[in-house]
Structures are given as C-alpha cells and as structure tokens.
Curated annotation (Swiss-Prot):
Cofactor or coenzyme needed: heme
Secretion signal span: 1-35
Topology in the lipid bilayer: Single-pass membrane protein
Annotated keywords: Chloroplast, Electron transport, Heme, Iron, Membrane, Metal-binding, Photosynthesis, Plastid, Signal, Thylakoid, Transmembrane, Transmembrane helix, Transport
Family matches, as Pfam families: Apocytochr_F_C, Apocytochr_F_N
Subcellular location field: Plastid, Chloroplast thylakoid membrane
Protein name: Cytochrome f
Binding-site positions, heme: 36, 56, 59-60
Cellular component GO terms held in the UniProt record: chloroplast thylakoid membrane
Species this protein is from: Nasturtium officinale (Watercress)
Lineage: Eukaryota, Viridiplantae, Streptophyta, Embryophyta, Tracheophyta
Cofactor remark: Binds 1 heme group covalently.
Family (UniProt): Belongs to the cytochrome f family.
Length: 320
C-alpha cells in the first residue's frame, strides 16, 4: 500500500513538473516572439499609412538613411533581387534590454506592388541564395504576400539584405498589367524607443515628471534608479523610475524643471524609409523594339553599301 502511494506521489510530481515546464516554455516563447521588431504586424493592418509614412517610425524615433536597389525593368514570371541597404557605423554599441551594451540588429519591411511576392526556393539561383544567406523572410499577413518583413538580424552581417522577388505574369493574373510600379521600403538599425503599448524602452531619454529638488537617488539592486523629486511649493514627492543601462545627468540636491532630461540619450540607431520604381515589361514589346533596332541597323548598312556603290559609279564615269 505504501509503495502504491509512493508511486502515485511520484506520478503527481512528474505531472506537475511537466506542466510548470510547459507553462514556462509558453511564456518564454511568447515573450521572445513579442520582442521581435515585427510589432507592426500585431498592431497595424497595413504598415504604410495613407500619408506614406511607414508605421515602424512610431517606435523608432530617430531618422536614419535607408536605400533600395531594384532593376529598372523585369519580365513577367522572372526572379529578381531587391537589395535593401541599412548603413551605420559598425563600431557603435546599443543599450540592450538587460542594460548591457551590445551590437546593433537590423530589420526591414518591403512593400511590393500587388502580384509581386517572395520567390519560392526552387526558383532562386545558387548565386542569389549565397547573397541571401540564412535569412528567413515572412509575409506581413497571410493574405498580403506582396509585403515582406525580416528581422531582427545581426547588423554586422546583414546591413545589406537581399530579397528574392518573383514578378507576376499578366497572362495568368488578370489584376496585373504591364506598367511602372512603386516599391516602398523601411529599414531600422538598433532597438526602438517606444513599445507598441506606448511605454518607453531603456533606449531613450527619460525626463522629469515634475519640477523641484532631487532629494534622493536610489540605485536599485538589479540596475536602474529611483529618483525622488520634492516640489518646494507643496512638499509633494514624485518618484521617477529609470531603467537599467542609462546614464544619469542629475545628482542629489539639484534643482530641476518639469520635462528636464534625467538621462543622456543612449540611442545610436534609427529608422528610415525610401522608394523605387520598377517596370513590368511586356516581352512582345521588347521583341518589337529589338526588331525595330535591327531594321534601323540593316537600313544603315544598306545605305552605306548603296553610297559606296554610287561612289564607284561616279568614279568610273570620271575615269571614262
């Protein structure tokens, strides 16, 4: 009887341990997923607002350059490269969520015309695969195959991101036409300053929420500070919480004003957006152009031959 109770107790403990481990895994996985800079997918139906502004700029407040290179023209049902360049100083270090310094990561969103989409693996050439590396692209939404996102990925390795794109074929997709189309891109380097819920990260400036005298600065055990501000007019105390990793600009006994910076600005990254144009070219139009150019060349050749023949006739008449 005692042995049976012992086995029952062991079985309950194992079940409880598995349940706890599973819960920890789910919570950890969720926090990792939500930590990716693809927050726009969770909060915006379309990453590009009606004003043309890409919503990533809501979290990445600093303005930095980004560039995109695409062919001027592409033929239907062909694969081409869209290269997004996110330049920055590789020597820079950013403040990580744990307060330590680390390398910058990068991310990008590519908004293609309707009908254009990520090329399937079997259509990508070995040379293009080598340029892509180990990158894994995602659709912004299952029904928005023309909008692609990537990141975060190590900036030192992927400051240039090559997207393999498959051009549509108007012969099979009646919604696509042989026209000039715009392509929009947004790219960030480094962490954002604002989370989607509106709260600040530790990668931005923290300002005083009240004016007065700093009566106390408490350094927290796990990093960060609690700054107590006393309003001299009514003795009201306000405590501002500063997360770890930030450098203070103030000291105890100092008089400060409302919204005065309490920390330096740690942000070394930023977000930028750009655009390009691409022409989906009709192959028949290309063939017609080649035929026309060939006709012009042949006409020039016949003209030269005719001129030489005429000169020979003139020369023979003069000799006669």
């Amino acid at each position: 009887m005692q042995t049976r109770n012992t086995f029952s107790w062991i079985r309950e403990e194992i079940t409880r341990s598995i349940s706890v481990s599973l819960m920890i895994y789910i919570i950890t996985w969720a926090s990792i997923s939500s930590a990716y800079p693809i927050f726009a997918q969770q909060n915006y139906e379309n990453p590009r607002e009606a004003t043309g502004r890409i919503v990533c700029a809501n979290c990445h407040l600093a303005n930095k350059p980004v560039d995109i290179e695409v062919p001027q023209t592409v033929l239907p049902d062909t694969v081409f490269e869209a290269v997004v360049k996110i330049p920055y100083d590789m020597q820079l270090k950013q403040v990580l969520a744990n307060g330590k310094k680390g390398a910058l990561n990068v991310g990008a969103v590519l908004i293609l015309p309707e009908g254009f989409e990520l090329a399937p693996p079997d259509r990508i050439s070995p040379e293009m695969k080598e340029k892509i590396g180990n990158l894994s692209f995602q659709n912004y939404r299952p029904d928005k195959k023309n909008i692609l996102v990537i990141g975060p990925v190590p900036g030192q390795k992927y400051s240039e991101i090559t997207f393999p794109i498959l051009a549509p074929d108007p012969a099979t997709n009646k919604d696509v036409h042989f026209l000039k189309y715009p392509i929009y891109v947004g790219g960030n380097r480094g962490r954002g300053q604002i989370y989607p819920d509106g709260s600040k990260s530790n990668n931005t400036v923290y300002n005083a929420t009240a004016g007065g005298i700093i009566s106390k600065i408490l350094r927290k055990e796990k990093g960060g500070y609690e700054i107590t501000i006393v309003d001299a007019s009514n003795e009201r105390q306000v405590i501002d919480i500063i997360p770890r990793g930030l450098e203070l600009l103030v000291s105890e006994g100092e008089s400060i004003k409302l919204d005065q910076p309490l920390t330096s600005n740690p942000n070394v990254g930023g977000f930028g957006q750009g655009d390009a144009e691409i022409v989906l070219q009709d192959p028949l139009r290309v063939q017609g152009l080649l035929f026309f150019l060939g006709s012009v060349v042949l006409a020039q050749i016949f003209l030269v031959l005719k001129k030489k023949q005429f000169e020979k006739v003139q020369l023979s008449e003069m000799n006669f």
